[in-house]
Amino acid sequence: MSAWLGTATLALGRVTLRPFTVDDAEALSEVVGDPERFRWVPGVPTDVSSSRTWIEAALADPSRRIAYAVVDNTDGRLVGTTSYYDIDPGNLTAAIGYTFYTESVQGTAINPTAKYLLMRHAFEDCGAVRLVWHTHESNAQSRAAIAKLGATFEGLLRKHRRFGEGWRTTALYAMTDDDWPGARDRLLARIGR
């Protein structure tokens, strides 16, 4: 476990983030639906076996990644996932990503609430100074969602990650602890808190 960020369960209103377990494989297998919706996200699990493998990989090195199941508290369903990764306690930084949701909750308050919980925990409880987001440069939906959180676009990282048979150019976004108070207030207004 990351001693710095820990693995606390985080909750607000309709959303609970709790650490994944392998027992979540069946529920996770129902999240993706049409894999074409996730063409920019390599390796999304589409059945119970690939979900189990995905969860095992997500849990393999908890000092570098903390994977959360996103639960919709209105019905208790697992509706997606999000993670801290590239955790660097020495520099008080981490990335937020490995995020995907079932189609029925996309465009709702689920994602902004989940991201608010991760950012609040990192900045306010753990003293983070910088959080970053990475996405494929052509993933317009993800880029718009990250920008709406209040993160600043910092540039493109060429040949940053493998992507299929080639390489991905990554759009890099970041938020610092100096940015957080304003972003927090806008996010709380957005999610109705």
PLM feature segments, named:
Residues 134, 152-166:
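Conserved catalytic-core motifs of GNAT/GCN5-like acyltransferases
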Residues 133-143:
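Conserved beta-strand-loop-alpha-helix junction that forms the acyl-donor binding cleft
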Residues 1-110, 121, 125, 160-193:
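GNAT-family acyltransferases
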Residues 124-134:
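Conserved GNAT acetyl-CoA-binding A-motif
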